[in-house]
């Protein structure tokens, strides 16, 4: 029963998240002009970091507060155990947010539509054909973010364990430290990146979304290499903070890039394909790649700091090259978008 419930919850969350973000990106692109799109998507994207931080803080509070309580009886549901009540408490605010969104957010007027199939779903083959026409742009974004994601998710998975093995901290304290850094500096970096994108767009640099991605990946690379190699936590913490900040600068840039070069009726599907192409390798091989280097290159569990440095350095360098390769293609995609865009 427990396994079935957890699996059902995980499936439902996955479907919800996979549906929400592509649709949200497309709606935001209809609500805001190009010169404000970076900040708008950045504000939305900070939810990743703020949510992760709140999950740690509020989730920990809920577990500590409720775990020792006695089961309670609720109408219809019957006896509720403490662990079940914990899920209910942390999940209930979601219903409040759903109600607020349902009654305050309306469907925006669609802009930048290429097809005449108003109100009908566009065939998936048409989306693939469009992406093939812009293959240099989408290819560089997909490959660049898959490679960068391997480095990033490798760090997310192993940083607490690295701090424990290398610097002797308790795993709980290490996780809380990195979680706090990730939440605060990640949100700050995302907002900064969105503001810089809009400022440069207003100055006439329309290719800034993809160009800045390459720059931000390049900026984050040395911090990914050096953070695990610091001899003390006194030095590792500021390096970790800079890594979180520079890595998050690009968080809203690819959504901006995809929304600007893709017609309205294709945007959500294009974004979904981006998530599939980038997150599958990142989540599938991020943590695994660090473990493989640790086991088969160094054959030493306490060499994890070297593994993090190598995986981070190699993957981020390749990701930067891939994104830089797409800059010219992105400029060409922007030029083609003038055929169907409502505004210049």
Regions found by a protein language model. Name each.
Residues 107-142, 166-169, 343:
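Juxtamembrane intracellular "pre-TM" segments in multi-pass secondary transporters
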Residues 44, 48-103:
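Helix-loop-helix hairpin linking two adjacent transmembrane segments in secondary transporters
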Residues 198-216:
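Cytoplasmic membrane-interface "Motif A"-like loop-to-helix N-cap segments
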Residues 1-9, 226-239:
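Helix-loop junctions at membrane interfaces in 12-TM secondary transporters
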Residues 97-104, 221-230, 309-343:
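Multi-pass alpha-helical transporter architecture, strongest
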Residues 134-193, 247-251, 255, 282-290:
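Extracytoplasmic gate region of multi-pass secondary transporters
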Residues 39-67, 182-190, 275-287:
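Glycine-rich segments within core transmembrane alpha-helices of 12-TM secondary carriers
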Residues 8-49:
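Cytoplasmic helix-loop-helix junction between adjacent transmembrane helices
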């Amino acid at each position: 029963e427990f396994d079935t419930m957890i699996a059902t919850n995980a499936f439902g969350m996955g479907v919800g998240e996979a549906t929400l973000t592509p649709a949200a990106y497309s709606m935001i692109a209809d609500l805001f002009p190009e010169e404000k799109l970076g900040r708008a998507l950045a504000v939305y994207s900070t939810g990743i970091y703020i949510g992760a931080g709140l999950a740690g803080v509020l989730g920990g509070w809920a577990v500590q507060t409720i775990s020792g309580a006695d089961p309670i009886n609720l109408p219809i549901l019957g006896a509720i155990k403490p662990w079940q009540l914990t899920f209910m408490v942390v999940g209930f605010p979601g219903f409040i947010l759903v109600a607020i969104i349902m009654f305050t957010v309306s469907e925006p007027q669609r802009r930048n539509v290429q097809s005449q199939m108003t109100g009908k779903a566009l065939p998936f083959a048409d989306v693939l054909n469009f992406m093939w026409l812009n293959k240099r742009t989408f290819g560089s974004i997909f490959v660049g973010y898959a490679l960068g994601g391997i480095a990033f998710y490798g760090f997310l998975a192993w940083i607490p364990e690295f701090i424990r093995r290398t610097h002797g901290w308790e795993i709980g304290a290490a996780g809380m430290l990195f979680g706090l850094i990730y939440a605060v500096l990640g949100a700050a970096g995302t907002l900064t990146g969105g503001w810089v994108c809009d400022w440069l767009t207003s100055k006439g640099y329309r290719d800034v979304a993809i160009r800045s991605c390459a720059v931000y990946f390049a900026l984050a690379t040395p911090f990914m290499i050096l953070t695990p190699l610091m001899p003390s936590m006194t030095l590792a913490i500021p390096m970790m903070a800079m890594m979180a900040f520079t890595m998050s600068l690009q968080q809203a840039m690819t959504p901006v890039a995809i929304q600007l070069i893709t017609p309205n009726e294709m945007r959500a599907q294009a974004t979904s394909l981006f998530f599939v192409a980038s997150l599958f390798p990142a989540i599938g091989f991020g943590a695994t790649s660090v473990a493989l280097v640790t086991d088969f290159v160094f054959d030493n569990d306490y060499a994890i700091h070297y593994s993090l440095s190598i995986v981070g350095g190699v993957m981020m360098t390749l990701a930067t090259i891939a994104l830089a390769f797409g800059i010219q293609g992105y400029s060409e995609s922007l030029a083609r978008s003038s055929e169907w865009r409502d505004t210049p």
